[in-house]
Amino acid sequence: MVLKETLRLYPPALFVNRTVTRDVKLGKLDIPAGTQVNLPIVHIHHDVDIWGANAEEFDPLRFADGKSYHLGAYFPFGIGPAICVGQNLTMVEAKLALAMVLQRFAFDVSPSYVHAPMMVMTLQPQYGAQVLVRKI
């Protein structure tokens, strides 16, 4: 739940590009085949219409009890035929690494930390991420 919520708020990519393979009607919009479409992952993952009024807040319980959302609402590793082939390995490795680190260390956010996510090619902390680390 914690990793899923982290990936929702801070996806590894800001957007994915896709080429429309056939003419599509999306609501009142006609999208011809060959059109390049950018799917803004970070904006969809922060959409209050999908995630609720607290969409900007870290809430791992969004994913509790196997709760899921519409396929197009959560896609930190992309979507469709070009989805990241390493997503399952990444999640397993992240869970193992996080468990090993949390068994040995405690973390606190530094008083000097300023939360300011910045969109470049990826989502990055504008002023760094000052963390106080203490061995357990």
Name the predicted role of every residue range.
Residues 1-27:
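Conserved cytochrome P450 K-helix E-x-x-R motif and the immediately C-terminal K′/meander segment
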Residues 106, 124-136:
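C-terminal helix/juxtamembrane-tail motif
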Residues 39-67:
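Conserved cytochrome P450 K-helix/beta-meander segment immediately N-terminal to the heme-binding cysteine loop
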Residues 66-75:
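Active-site-adjacent bridging/hinge elements
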Residues 87-124:
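Cytochrome P450 heme-binding "Cys pocket" and the immediately downstream C-terminal segment
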